[in-house]
Curated annotation (Swiss-Prot):
Belongs to the purine/pyrimidine phosphoribosyltransferase family. GfcR subfamily. InterPro entries: GfcR-like (IPR022854), PRibTrfase_dom (IPR000836), PRTase-like (IPR029057). This is Transcriptional regulator GfcR. It comes from Methanobrevibacter smithii (strain ATCC 35061 / DSM 861 / OCM 144 / PS). SUPFAM superfamilies: PRTase-like.
């Protein structure tokens, strides 16, 4: 399994993916993605960072399954109030957020917009720019916002998004994720809801 991950990470790097994009694609932390891309087959390898590879392709490749999971995430989000904006973290949070906006509008009767956030980790490593809320989707200004992603590993990206939402005048009321590898119950006083929590014994 490890050799397959190393090969996949290196193939993604050759196709121009940044470390952040590789981390998202393989559902591993940035440290693990960096380690995977630096491996050389014939040399002695440093010890790998502790992480878990999450493969949810059987879910991500099926719209019916995505809809069911998005319904469950929507139900969890409702326990924190009525959201006016569902913000998906690019890339893998967007499909969930899109379906959740539809579900939550039907469930709560409150008009619910979709917003998209492009995190800093998707930028080229040499770029010191910040992540950004896309202007092609809904605005978070003056709105109650639920943040959505597929996997939370360290919480760094979610913390970045929470700050961006607040900086744009929004109020983050919850973070919903498919899989939580962080073990955190909240970030910046915003509760985290997950369908699955992963931890080491």
């Amino acid at each position: 399994m490890k050799q397959k991950l190393i090969k996949k990470a290196q193939e993604l790097r050759q196709h121009g993916f940044t470390t952040g994009e590789i981390a998202d694609e393989l559902n591993v932390s940035m440290d693990t993605a960096r380690w995977l891309t630096l491996q050389k087959p014939a040399e002695e390898k440093p010890e790998a960072p502790v992480d878990f590879f999450i493969n949810w392709k059987s879910l991500g490749g099926n719209s019916t399954r995505l809809r069911y999971v998005s319904g469950a995430l929507s139900d969890m989000a409702l326990s924190h109030g009525e959201a006016e904006v569902i913000l998906g973290i690019a890339v893998s949070g967007i499909p969930f957020a899109t379906m959740m906006a539809d579900f939550l509008e039907d469930m709560s009767g409150v008009e619910t917009s979709l917003a998209v956030y492009h995190p800093h980790k998707h930028r080229k490593e040499k770029d010191d720019g910040e992540g950004a809320i896309s202007t092609n989707f809904g605005s978070v200004e003056g709105k109650k916002v639920v943040i959505v992603d597929d996997v939370i590993t360290s919480g760094k990206t979610v913390k970045e998004v929470i700050h961006a939402v607040k900086d744009h005048g929004g109020e983050p009321i919850a973070v919903t994720v498919l899989i939580d590898k962080s073990g955190l119950s909240e970030i910046e006083e915003v509760p985290i809801e997950s369908l699955i929590k992963v931890g080491r014994l």
